């Protein structure tokens, strides 16, 4: 190759690199525009500690202390129900009655007339305060399933968790904590 061809080729390569860098920068700016800053963290499910000890030892209290101690200005919101099943959690999150009823019907059909735990077909009476959503722009932590409501089917539990996640504006950041059910019907074995 002669000198002119090399110069021409180098100029083309530089232009391609500059164009690629500009496109990458544009993509980064687009991503920045789409990313929303979470106003806090919201805990859904159960804290597994009852009474006064919950105020000191629940994972929400510990999480709030860790955030504060490490300089994060994020509030941890408590949307847990002591002893609440997943159906009640979905109701509290605003999942449609039709969707919740489809789970109940499925549970009743699977039971084939056998007696079910109340959390498999029952939904708690919830107060307006419990169903009011002040957490839509928060990062959800979902820790549910211990008390039932998912017919001992881990795939159904995952689907119910997703139903709650779908009620949030930003679905890019979340934590799902797994727990085995209180009755021991599903284990990791």
Describe the function of each predicted region:
Residues 77-117:
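Acidic/histidine-rich helix-loop elements
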